[in-house]
Curated annotation (Swiss-Prot):
Annotated substrate binding sites: D10, S11, Y42, G43, N74, T75, T184, H185
GO molecular function: glutamate racemase activity
Organism name: Streptococcus thermophilus (strain ATCC BAA-250 / LMG 18311)
Gene (name only): murI
Cited Pfam families: Asp_Glu_race (PF01177)
Domain of life: Bacteria
Lineage: Bacteria, Bacillati, Bacillota, Bacilli, Lactobacillales
Name recorded for this polypeptide: Glutamate racemase
Length: 271
């Protein structure tokens, strides 16, 4: 038993899609979440900057005495997950491998689509993981740089969002039977994406798939929390507007949440 919280980090609100799944599958676990919305999206940024920012988020979570870290951001996973995993003595999960495995299991035609940020797509990380596990699969990757900003600005139900998704997804329509949502922001656009791609296309939420691996590792390392839900804690931090984050978080999680603003430079300087 280990009653310490699980730490989640993301470039903004996207990682809440992973938290929602964790709360569904493992409702007794405590959570600390940090979203770097002030510097979102990470996707267009250079790798060195993404690495620096992600390490700041990791260091912040370590000050909260977390027992495990979930990098709930595909871009950060692509750039720095391996390095962080090797550097820490607690389990560190990324979201790419679970999403890749689920896509392989889902696809019948062998035609898999992947959408993500420019950095995730240019890194080729999904294609590499999928091909390593199943060389016969054909992977079609598409960068969708306008999706994460729509989510961060809470415009997911707008006509603009529908137009952008329709225009962006056109190259993949009728070409794949499985589509990996290779950014944790994208499940918030899931209804629109599904409508554009058609009901026959299976959408893979890489973040939700990751929670299954969280459960496996909790058991393996015997660091599950005692199943007393009443004593669990949830802390949510953002580097940007508390109100903006809170609005999206409450819509997505379906409950009231308390959000705190954090200045990472000051927080880590004082640590």
């Amino acid at each position: 038993m280990d009653n310490r919280p699980i730490g989640f980090l993301d470039s903004g609100v996207g990682g809440l899609t992973v938290v929602r799944e964790l709360k569904r599958q493992l409702p007794y676990e405590s959570i600390v979440y940090i979203g770097d919305s002030a510097r979102a999206p990470y996707g267009p940024r250079p790798a060195g900057q993404i690495r620096e920012y992600t390490w700041q988020l990791v260091k912040f979570l370590l000050t909260k005495d977390v027992k495990m870290i979930v990098i709930a951001c595909n871009t950060a996973t692509a750039v720095v997950w391996e390095e962080i995993k090797e550097s820490l003595d607690i389990p560190v999960l990324g979201v790419v491998l679970p999403g890749s495995s689920a896509a392989i299991k889902s696809s019948r035609s062998g035609q898999i689509g992947v959408i993500g940020t420019p950095m995730t797509i240019s890194s080729n990380i999904y294609e590499q993981k999928i091909k390593r596990l199943a060389p016969q699969m054909n992977v079609l990757s598409l960068s969708c740089p306008r999706f994460a900003p729509i989510v961060e600005s809470n415009e997911i139900n707008s006509s603009v969002a529908k137009k952008i998704v329709y225009e962006s997804m056109a190259p993949l329509v009728d070409r794949v039977d499985t589509l990996v949502l290779g950014c944790t922001h994208y499940p918030l656009l899931r209804p629109i994406i599904q409508n554009v791609m058609g009901l026959s296309v299976k959408l893979i939420d890489s973040g939700a798939e990751t929670v299954r691996d969280v459960s496996v590792l909790l058991n393996y390392f015997e660091i599950n929390r005692s199943r007393e839900v009443k004593d669990k804690t949830e802390e949510y931090y953002t580097t940007a507007s508390v109100l903006g984050f809170k609005e999206i978080a409450e819509q997505w999680l379906g409950e009231e949440v308390t959000v705190q603003h954090v200045d990472l430079d000051k927080e880590l300087e004082n640590d």
